[in-house]
């Protein structure tokens, strides 16, 4: 994707050639997705079905790539994760054992994966998601599709992504110092 869109407005040069997504990281690690069984409605008139959510997000990549690799890794995963560790991830990225509130107080920020780990059910993600890079609106963006048993699962996951349960750091809110939220803006939802 990067090679196809080199030079596109808002798509900076430092994106690694082998990066599957514009932000430079892999999305589909083993065990970081809900299973089909996890997202299937078990009973009732919609048994065997699921619910779907689709968002279109604009990405602010210029300022993202002004961050050091260390800072990008910290924001994607957790402040305690190093670039060397992140490069070796093939399975679900482990969330630090430290509680989210403690990380926020200690580092003044939390990581995207770390925040999402707080909403798992029996240790597994609640949504089955797909992220697809796009330039359809003239700049870098992302189509985000999720399947979940109930829209409540999407809402809980979205609240976790906003670190809704942690306000331990004065500079942490739903966007600032909160994973990758500062570099994404929802333009459409359905």
What are these regions (language model features)?
Residues 1-190:
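Long, histidine/aromatic-enriched segments associated with O2/redox biology
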């Amino acid at each position: 994707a990067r090679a196809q869109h080199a030079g596109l407005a808002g798509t900076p040069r430092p994106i690694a050639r082998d990066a599957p997504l514009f932000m430079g990281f892999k999305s589909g690690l083993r065990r970081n997705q809900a299973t089909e069984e996890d997202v299937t409605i078990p009973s009732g008139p919609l048994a065997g079905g699921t619910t779907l959510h689709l968002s279109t997000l604009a990405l602010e990549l210029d300022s993202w790539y002004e961050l050091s690799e260390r800072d990008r890794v910290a924001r994607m995963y957790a402040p305690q994760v190093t670039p060397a560790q992140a490069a070796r991830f093939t399975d679900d990225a482990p969330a630090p054992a430290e509680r989210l509130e403690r990380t926020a107080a200690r580092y003044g920020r939390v990581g995207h994966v770390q925040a999402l780990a707080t909403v798992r059910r029996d240790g597994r993600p609640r949504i089955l998601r797909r992220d697809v890079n796009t330039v359809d609106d003239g700049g870098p963006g992302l189509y985000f599709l999720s399947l979940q048993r109930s829209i409540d699962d999407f809402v809980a996951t979205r609240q976790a992504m906003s670190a809704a349960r942690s306000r331990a750091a004065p500079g942490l809110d739903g966007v600032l110092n909160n994973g990758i939220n500062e570099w994404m803006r929802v333009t459409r939802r359905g």
